[in-house]
Every structure is written in structure tokens, then in C-alpha cells.
């Protein structure tokens, strides 16, 4: 049996046990999963560090000098789609959107839906993408493109020839990944391939759906990832799906390997839209454990918890002009409680590296649901405020220290980027450094005026 056959048979990679050591089982009671969350966060998201503080001239600073150590960015990616940037109802809404997005998050998902992005063949809407990229750069926001391939709606101009349609799809993947190399280096390459042939997409995307059927799901995802990798060899490539059952692993992930059996993907993307019902801690943990067995990082790519009535059937009522899926006080309280629980569980799992919220504001949110972290009028919901307290408070490091022997300062902090500062003779000196899991030796920090 070759490596690919072994992976298909076992449903995991050679490093499948890496993320699952000493963790609770998926069928453990809710209390154990939650009670141990802070302990796991302390273990997996923080570390001890030693800083060697030197001056602008490269010489050690004197012992006894006090320094402040301030985190400026998380390594973990806390994100949201950024579809409404500069597209809110009023200039005031746009300003509020930008301010609150930047205050909370460090990761933005940009739209690349083919049928919208290239409404006329050969005329992609790159200008809008470049506008968002510039904003993200100005706010030190990591970017991701979503998605390069998804048979959800056929572009109107797509020829009704499956083989040609697939050629155009692969060409499109290459073009986007190559054009935005350096600006967007994280991509959802293929979206929702597990159940690619469900009835709704057969109606909306008959050409692409038939092209996938004819090519075969395994060949389709492999060729898509090869095209993206060739266009941007250093990109982080995700497979993404709403299916969290074994079918995703068996039908797609286990197929997404080279002839020698090595994964063609870098990250496994998991959608978690909870319009109908909130996931229990056990279900959330089970999803993490199921896909961590592949030995690759996990991104929760599309997370929704509504702040109003729950139920997928409510989207069907949108045709009624008198119906509004509204946010409520009770729903907002429930949303906040569930969001904090969900994020604590995910942040405590060592395989998870990113969480992306789906729709920052209720304005034109997907399914017209009250899914935002901020309301229709751009005021923050309790969920936003609670996340801010976690991400920039409880999970954020601010520390003081005194330079000791050898110009060293010891501290413990969350992984991410930091600024160190001190004052000498009325002058403020600052320097920066990065702390991550790979940091083992003393980090040299040069302080300058």
C-alpha cells in the first residue's frame, strides 16, 4: 500500500497524533471541556521568554532600568469577512465599521466569488480588491481571499462545455493567486466540495457542477490546489467546507494528496454557521479533534451565532415584506454568552490557528440574519464588547520588568508582536520583537529614540 492508500485507509496523516496529546475526548462532559479551557490556553497560547535589551549603539542597557512590554498584535488570527468595507449605508456607518473592525481584529477575508468578481469575461473587479488590500495594509491586517473555486453560481458568460469551463476555472485560480501574490497569501482554494452536487447548486451552477462530476471530486481539488501552488508557491492554501462529518475527511481531505501521499493543502477550513442552533461544547471539540488528526492547522473560516430568533427556516420568510429577522435584547445576551464559550474552546485547542466571524454588521448580513457583532446602526452588541475584553484584555499581554544581569528581562506572554519601551534622561526608547512557539533563545531587542 502506498502513502495515499495508507492515508485513505487511516483517515489521518503521519503526524496525526501531534495535536491530540493530553486533550479531553469529544464525548467528555461540557464541564470538563470548559473548565480546562484556561489551562489549555495558558499551555498552548503563551510561553516564557527572555529579552536581551540593548541600546541603539548595540551595547547592553544598565541593570535596574525599568521597561514596559506591550503586546501590539496576536499571532492567532481573529478575523471576519470585510465585505462591507466602504459599502455601508452612510459615511458615518462606514467610519464606525472601520474603527470597530480594526479595534478588534487582525485578519480579513476578501470576496472572490467568481460570478460577482468577473461579471464580464476578462474584466475582473480588481480595483475593489486593491482598495481593501490598501486598507488592510494600513491597519496591519492579514488578508485571505475567499474562494478561488466554488460551484455555487455559474458566471453568466461561462460556456456550457464542462471541459472548457474547468479549464477556465483553473486558469482563474492561477490568475488570482499570481496577481495578488504578496498582498494576499492565504486562500480558500476550493469551497464546499464534499456535497458539490446538492440540488441547489445543480440549479444555480449546472455547468461547473457537471464539470466537477465529469472530472471527479478528487481530481478537481488536486488540480485546483496545484494551480494555486504553482502561481504562489509560498501561499497558505485551505480546503474549506460546511460539512463537519466524516464525509469531508473521506471524500475530500483524504483525496487531496499528491501521488506520493503528501498533503497538497496547508490548512483545513471548517465552517460553523449556527443560524439554526448553537453547537454544544462537545460538538465543537469533536470537530476540532476529527480534523486535527490530519496533522494540519485548523481555521474556523465562517462562524455565525445569531442575536435573534434561531432557525434556518427563518431565511425562507425573507420573501414576506413584513418579516424582519431582528436582533433582540434576549438574543444579544445569548449570542454574547455563546460566542465567548465558542471562542474559549477554539482558542484552547492547539490545532486551531484562526477564527473568522461571518458578517461584522447586521447590515445586509448573509441570510439577512442578525449575525453581526455590531447592529444595523453600527452600535456594538454585547458579543463585540465581550470579544474585545478577551482578545485585547484577558488574552493580551502588558507587563513591566527590570533589566537584570546580562541586560536580560524575563516575562511570560501570549504569542504575537510586542513593543518594549523605557525612558532614559527624559527620552523614550522603543523596540519591537515577536514571540512564538519557536522562540527558544533570548530575543535581542534594540531600543531606539
Pin down the residues of each PLM region.
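Acidic-and-aromatic substrate-binding clefts and catalytic sites of carbohydrate-active enzymes
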Residues: 84-93, 115-127, 153-155, 194-198, ...
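Twin-arginine (Tat) signal peptide motif
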Residues: 1-7
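Aromatic-rich peripheral "rim/lid" segments of glycoside hydrolase catalytic domains that contact
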Residues: 193-214, 220, 227, 286-290, ...
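Beta-strand-rich domain onsets/edges
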Residues: 26-85, 119, 144, 216-219, ...
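N-terminal export signals
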Residues: 7-24
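Glycoside hydrolase catalytic-domain groove-lining segments
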Residues: 130-137, 211-239, 247-320, 343-347, ...
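Short Pro-Gly-centered beta-turn/loop motif in secreted/extracellular proteins
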Residues: 96, 100-103, 410-417
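Substrate-binding cleft and catalytic face of glycoside hydrolase catalytic domains
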Residues: 107-120, 130-235
